[in-house]
């Protein structure tokens, strides 16, 4: 069938299989063109492996270091006239290319927060790899979590803490810049967001993998966070999501102590740059900030996407054969170019004057839009979007029981 983008709010409800495959192909080509990673990881587990930083780290591990990879994610296959989710198509393309290159790649689709999916993953690691996982990437962005032991349901929210936040935001599709007010979160919302986006599940994963002897001596595990400039602090760093990320950082310190004593391993936090992802599109204020950031970083020739960021994380931080450089809080900083003084001063200056009339010229909102559509496989060169495509794509390692068409 012919697949066109259908955008509702900040989400696109359709995905293009060939476009997603092309996008993944571009990332793979980037990784293959880089000098190979010496001393890179060999057996990598990526939790949240189908889009964004998780997918990019899977590609860098596989095509940059020749690693075997297992990816865990929650995606849906095509059903009837409904396309699959982008992460499903991304993984189908990744696995196909990895297998053709002689690389081990298997995936598990299900709720990563559940005990059942953890057990399935452990069984696969024991059966196929006999343990020995030397890198675990934790990259989950989810709106809700069911606690595996208590069954309690937590929903995460993106809200400030303490007081109503007033600033401006942009409707990326129309380019309309308007004032936005966001009411502060309740205590329950703060706790819930921490339960979903904090370090609780990361710790459960690492403890389970350790218990079943799945981790190698010297294992590293990395989770991602964002700090950003003061401009976004109220809604991000000092808001509910920031509170959850503080919990994630605390978890990293605890896991680091455990892994260090048991396996000479490390647990690390990587502070990444702001990028267009399905997760960041949902945060008020942030898309306008990213549109300005893109323009300035592109002008200075220091713009990076997910794949460039993950390449730098692996090459210059995790596997540089030197001590991993961190900030005073022990975090890896690959947001260093974004946070450069000259970049931030320019954004601050433009922020004051940006409005609906000048947003297209002052910012790179067009680049934001382009990246947003690309997440769903649209707007890629060399794809005829007027042509019908087969929307059912198989992920080689996953057997799907066909649902009744809706």
UniProtKB/Swiss-Prot annotation:
On the tree of life, the source organism's domain of life is Bacteria
Question: What does the record give under GO molecular function?
Answer: enoyl-[acyl-carrier-protein] reductase (NADH) activity; NAD binding; trans-2-enoyl-CoA reductase (NADH) activity
- EC number(s) recorded for this UniProt protein: 1.3.1.9
Report residues binding substrate: 226
The positions annotated as site (Plays an important role in discriminating NADH against NADPH) read 75
Q: Which residues form the active site?
A: 236
Q: Its annotated pathway? A: Lipid metabolism; fatty acid biosynthesis
Reaction(s) catalysed by this chain, per the record, are: a 2,3-saturated acyl-[ACP] + NAD(+) = a (2E)-enoyl-[ACP] + NADH + H(+)
A single GO BP annotation from the record? Answer: fatty acid biosynthetic process
Q: What are the entry keywords?
A: Fatty acid biosynthesis, Fatty acid metabolism, Lipid biosynthesis, Lipid metabolism, NAD, Oxidoreductase
Keyword check for Cytoplasm, yes or no.
no
Chain sites annotated for binding NAD(+):
48-53, 74-75, 111-112, 140-141, 245, 275-277
Q: Does the keyword Nucleotide-binding apply?
A: no
Q: Which InterPro entries match?
A: Eno_Rdtase_FAD-bd_dom (IPR024906), Enoyl-CoA_Rdtase_cat_dom (IPR024910), FabV-like_NADH_b (IPR050048), Trans-2-enoyl-CoA_reductase (IPR010758)
Function of the protein: Involved in the final reduction of the elongation cycle of fatty acid synthesis (FAS II). Catalyzes the reduction of a carbon-carbon double bond in an enoyl moiety that is covalently linked to an acyl carrier protein (ACP).
Q: What family, per the record?
A: Belongs to the TER reductase family.
Assembly and partners?
A: Monomer.
Record protein name field = Enoyl-[acyl-carrier-protein] reductase [NADH]
Encoding gene, per UniProt annotation: fabV
């Amino acid at each position: 069938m012919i697949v066109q983008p259908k955008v509702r709010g900040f989400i696109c409800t359709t995905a293009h299989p060939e476009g997603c495959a092309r996008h993944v192909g571009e990332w793979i080509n980037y990784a293959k063109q880089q000098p190979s990673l010496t001393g890179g990881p060999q057996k990598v587990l990526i939790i949240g492996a189908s889009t964004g930083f998780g997918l990019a780290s899977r590609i860098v591990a596989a095509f940059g270091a020749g690693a075997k990879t297992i990816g865990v994610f929650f995606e849906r296959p095509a059903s009837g006239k409904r396309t699959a989710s982008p992460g499903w198509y991304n993984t189908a393309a990744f696995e196909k290319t990895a297998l053709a290159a002689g690389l081990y790649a298997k995936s598990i689709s299900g709720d990563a927060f559940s005990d059942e999916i953890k057990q399935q993953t452990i069984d696969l690691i024991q059966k196929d790899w006999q343990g020995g996982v030397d890198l675990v990437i934790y990259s989950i962005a989810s709106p809700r979590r069911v606690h595996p032991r208590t069954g309690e349901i937590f929903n995460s929210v993106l809200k400030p803490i303490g007081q109503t936040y007033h600033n401006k935001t942009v409707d990326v599709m129309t380019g309309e810049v308007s004032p936005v007010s966001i009411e502060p979160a309740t205590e329950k919302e703060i706790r819930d967001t921490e339960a979903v986006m904090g370090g609780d599940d990361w710790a459960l994963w690492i403890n389970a993998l350790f218990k079943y002897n799945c981790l190698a001596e010297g294992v590293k595990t990395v989770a991602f966070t964002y700090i950003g400039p003061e401009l976004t602090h109220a809604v991000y760093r000092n808001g509910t999501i920031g509170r959850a990320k503080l919990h994630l950082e605390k978890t990293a310190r605890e896991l680091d102590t455990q892994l260090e004593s048991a396996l000479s391993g490390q647990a690390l936090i990587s502070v990444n740059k702001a990028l267009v992802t399905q997760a960041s599109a949902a945060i008020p204020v942030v898309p306008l900030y990213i549109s300005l950031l893109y323009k300035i970083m592109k002008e200075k020739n220091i713009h990076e996407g997910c794949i460039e960021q993950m390449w730098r994380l692996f090459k210059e931080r995790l596997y540089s054969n030197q001590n991993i450089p961190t900030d005073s809080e022990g975090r890896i900083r690959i947001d260093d170019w974004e946070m450069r003084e000259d970049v931030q001063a320019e954004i601050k200056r433009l922020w004051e004057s940006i409005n609906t009339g000048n947003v297209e010229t002052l910012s790179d909102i067009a680049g934001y839009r382009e990246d947003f559509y690309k997440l769903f496989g649209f707007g890629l060169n060399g794809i005829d979007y007027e042509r019908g495509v087969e929307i059912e794509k198989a992920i080689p390692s996953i057997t799907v029981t066909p649902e009744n068409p809706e």
